[in-house]
């Protein structure tokens, strides 16, 4: 079983299998995601990284041909049961996608929208929450004088930080990021990476990335996946400097993938 013992576990994956129809996409995955740490999933395209990430908040639930078997324990509760409230799960486990996806509304309302689904706040309290989320996402100083402008008025990097602010505004416990920098320039990427490192003070962060250097810079633990299997899961420094499996070494040295 692949576990990291340096911190308490926030998510425990046990014998997880995932299917797209008859296609067996994830095969007997076992791993523990450490609380208030950054865990990165790396591997070539088609390895199952994003599929695994999306099981953590049941993004597949709208598609009846997709199914997960096994257990995913969030603080000890199996989220794969049919009794799991999807809305409450996604309030606990937020997600930021590959491309920035601001809502077609103001910067302020992008942040407030999700909060309104779960909380009834007075305007002053909502103003405070919006400022708090934008500050956490390192975006407040750039937006405080234009909160009522469209979210689309921001640059690509700012839009992605807006999406992160939107995700944390409802105060989740886990934040999932699926290739959050793939559409961004190097300067914006650097700011997002700094933000990811800061966010782990308050959240458990899981990131999917094709960029091995990004995983090495940002994460505490890294999982290498290949063809739906978890090949190796370790402390990030150990995985990149002294991998235990030849497949891992071949991938990080560019021999395949």
UniProtKB/Swiss-Prot annotation:
This enzyme catalyses: phosphate(out) + ATP + H2O = ADP + 2 phosphate(in) + H(+)
Query: Residues in domain ABC transporter?
Result: 11-252
On subunit structure and binding partners, the annotation says:
The complex is composed of two ATP-binding proteins (PstB), two transmembrane proteins (PstC and PstA) and a solute-binding protein (PstS).
> How does this protein sit in the membrane?
Peripheral membrane protein
Which Gene Ontology terms describe the biological processes this protein takes part in?
phosphate ion transmembrane transport
Coiled-coil intervals: none
Q: Which Pfam families match?
A: ABC_tran
Q: What does this protein do?
A: Part of the ABC transporter complex PstSACB involved in phosphate import. Responsible for energy coupling to the transport system.
Under the heading InterPro entries, the entry gives: AAA+_ATPase, ABC_transporter-like_ATP-bd, ABC_transporter-like_CS, P-loop_NTPase, PstB-like
Q: Where does this one sit in the cell?
A: Cell inner membrane
Entry annotated with the keyword Cell inner membrane: yes
Identify its protein family. Belongs to the ABC transporter superfamily. Phosphate importer (TC 3.A.1.7) family.
Name listed for the protein in its UniProt record:
Phosphate import ATP-binding protein PstB
E.C. code: 7.3.2.1
State the CDD domains in the record.
Answer: ABC_PstB_phosphate_transporter (cd03260)
In which organism is this protein found?
Answer: Salmonella choleraesuis (strain SC-B67)
Sorted keywords for this record are: ATP-binding, Cell inner membrane, Cell membrane, Membrane, Nucleotide-binding, Phosphate transport, Translocase, Transport
Query: Cellular component per GO?
Result: plasma membrane
